[in-house]
Amino acid sequence: MKLAILGAGCYRTHAASGITNFSRACEVAEMVGKPEIAMTHSTITMGAELKELAGVDEVVVADPVFDNQFTVIDDFAYEDVIEAHKEDPEKIMPQIREKVNEVAKELPKPPEGAIHFTHPEDLGFEITTDDREAVADADFIMTWFPKGDMQPDIINKFIDDIKPGAIVTHACTIPTTKFYKIFEQKHGDLVTKPETLNVTSYHPGAVPEMKGQVYIAEGYASEDAIETLFELGQKARGNAYRLPAELLGPVCDMCSALTAITYAGILSYRDSVTQVLGAPASFAQMMAKESLEQITALMEKVGIDKMEENLDPGALLGTADSMNFGASAEILPTVFEILEKRKK
């Protein structure tokens, strides 16, 4: 299998967050006995996993930065990074972030410059600046592109070189639905049948070098292609999840924090209503729908920054406490503390 990676990534944004580390990359490095994998990041980590753990025999990375200032920081011994991550990553991550931030001050942003700690060629990858060259005869095309609005112009340069049946994936910078539209608008005949072009995601849900997981969107690829990618993801990333394309953003992107809170609330509320009160699931669903729709309507009407002015958080303290039993009781006490702090 040939894997084409379009976009090598840059570590500066990962360092800037102050919370990321190389836990997954170090784990893979130890698993396969190749220390140089320990400080890979972004698509380079995922490419190394696919090559070393899933048997992908050809990996080509395309990025214009290879003709510009592709910078490899070699201040840190891979073995030291691996050892630190066995105990506490924060024993070494502050020094790494400090060095990256220092280099980033003088280095232009992608595609003119990028920060790495391992050169892809040292992992047995081929490199090129030509996307068309990379995607030629590729079975799996993993894109790691800038924000969505820039992607049509990038994709249109190589779309005619994608072979029928190829799997094409996106990550965190565009929804699957919008990603698919780019291909549909240019080559409707290429995507009318899923088996002719399989558009989906290989979304890590976090920085790839930190967590071993991948999320694969269903709806725009054949079942065979999804299953192939799922099996690759399980071998390479350790944990793979299939989900409808429209749920990829709520589950994987920044709003996942809100999705987690909301989903836990729905499940707990459902169980309290159906298991303790004995009400039918249809009633619980009706009430849940009313809550979600009206709170969403309030946010859209007044704006997320003015919600408290229109609904005092304290108004819920004397009503929601009557549902503080069953599964809901596992969540509500903490919720009450938050509402109490925010009430007028």
Curated annotation (Swiss-Prot):
Temperature dependence: Optimum temperature is 60 degrees Celsius.
Notes on how activity is controlled: Activity requires salt; 100 mM sodium or potassium salts of chloride, phosphate or sulfate are equally effective. Inactivated by O(2).
Pathway the protein contributes to: One-carbon metabolism; methanogenesis from CO(2); 5,10-methylene-5,6,7,8-tetrahydromethanopterin from 5,10-methenyl-5,6,7,8-tetrahydromethanopterin (hydrogen route): step 1/1
Entry-linked Pfam families: HMD, HMD_N
Keyword field: Methanogenesis, One-carbon metabolism, Oxidoreductase
Superkingdom in the source lineage: Archaea
GO molecular function: N5,N10-methenyltetrahydromethanopterin hydrogenase activity
Primary role: Catalyzes the reversible reduction of methenyl-H(4)MPT(+) to methylene-H(4)MPT.
Annotated NCBIfam families: hmd_TIGR (TIGR01723)
HAMAP family the record matches: HMD
Subunit note: Homotetramer.
Protein name: 5,10-methenyltetrahydromethanopterin hydrogenase
